[in-house]
């Protein structure tokens, strides 16, 4: 109890590092059409509803969260508006999916990562291009970018036609442990948000990227309900901890051990 109180006080002090905003992906603005060529939309053959997002990391591979997995999944690349089609949009289906078997944490939140090999490579275009894997881990207070077609309201089921983007900050992992009991100390996750609340990923943003310094550092995994609460940053899969596994799979070692 004392630890939680101390951490809560530290969180309040840390607010000085976060920019106050009245904005509610909850809390974002419409993304520029040219700023997310790596962002992909996931849906199924039986529904046109975007249930998750993902990230193109090369012409043949997409990174997302394992809890976004569905049967008959479809991957749309180059999309901005859900209703107005870009000329260079492409649709792909998985050739194979790779994920981490997790027996230690049955809820799956500790290893919420899935690597999808596309049946056919995509072609780079004005609105389709991969983003780099992290060359080093992110540090607390790093400024990052979130984006997705998820809910933009904490009180209503409001989903945008175009992806929304927002700037948030990495926070210390110890705070995640105190706030979320299901995040263990040895978890390969990170937390990020605006500690005053108001900016956050939300339902429908799962699997999407946390971009820091032009690299994907996180995958949207979980967080508070409702989204965007004060002192409750969201939880992201820490991509840096999986880079060796990702690169091994892509190189052809399909039996590579997940960390």
Swiss-Prot record:
Family, similarity comment: Belongs to the peptidase S1 family. Snake venom subfamily.
Keyword Glycoprotein: yes
Record organism: Macrovipera lebetinus
Main location (coarse class): secreted
Catalytic activity: Fully activates human clotting factor V by a single cleavage at the 1545-Trp-Tyr-Leu-Arg-|-Ser-Asn-Asn-Gly-1552 bond. Cattle, but not rabbit, factor V is cleaved, and no other proteins of the clotting system are attacked. Esterase activity is observed on Bz-Arg-OEt and Tos-Arg-OMe, and amidase activity on Phe-pipecolyl-Arg-NHPhNO2
Subcellular location: Secreted
Propiece residues: 19-24
Gene Ontology CC entries for this record: extracellular region; secretory granule
Protein name as catalogued: Factor V activator
Single GO MF annotation: serine-type endopeptidase activity
Keywords per UniProt: Blood coagulation cascade activating toxin, Disulfide bond, Glycoprotein, Hemostasis impairing toxin, Hydrolase, Protease, Secreted, Serine protease, Sialic acid, Signal, Toxin
Signal sequence segment: 1-18
BP GO annotations: proteolysis
Function: Venom serine protease that converts factor V (F5) to the active form Va in the presence of calcium ions and phospholipids. It cleaves the Arg(1545)-Ser(1546) linkage in the human factor V molecule. Has hydrolytic activities against BAEE (1.2 U/mg), TAME, and Pro-Phe-Arg-MCA (4.9 U/mg). Shows coagulant activity.
E.C. code: 3.4.21.95
InterPro entries: Peptidase_S1_PA, Peptidase_S1_PA_chymotrypsin, Peptidase_S1A, Trypsin_dom, TRYPSIN_SER
Disulfide bond annotation, renumbered to this chain: 31-165, 52-68, 100-258, 144-212, 176-191, 202-227
Enzyme class: hydrolase
Subunit structure as annotated in this protein's UniProt entry: Monomer.
Glycosylation sites: 253
Expression sites by tissue: Expressed by the venom gland.
Activity regulation as described: Inhibited by D-Phe-Pro-Arg-chloromethyl ketone (FPRCK) (98%), PMSF (93%), benzamidine (67%), and diisopropylfluorophosphate (DFP). Is not inhibited by BPTI, antithrombin and EDTA.
Active-site positions on this chain: 67, 112, 206
Organism ancestry: Eukaryota, Metazoa, Chordata, Craniata, Vertebrata
PTM info: N-glycosylated. Contains 4.4% of hexoses, 4.4% of hexosamines and 3.1% of sialic acids.
Note: Negative results: does not hydrolyze casein or asocasein, prothrombin, fibrinogen and fibrin. Does not induce or inhibit platelet aggregation.
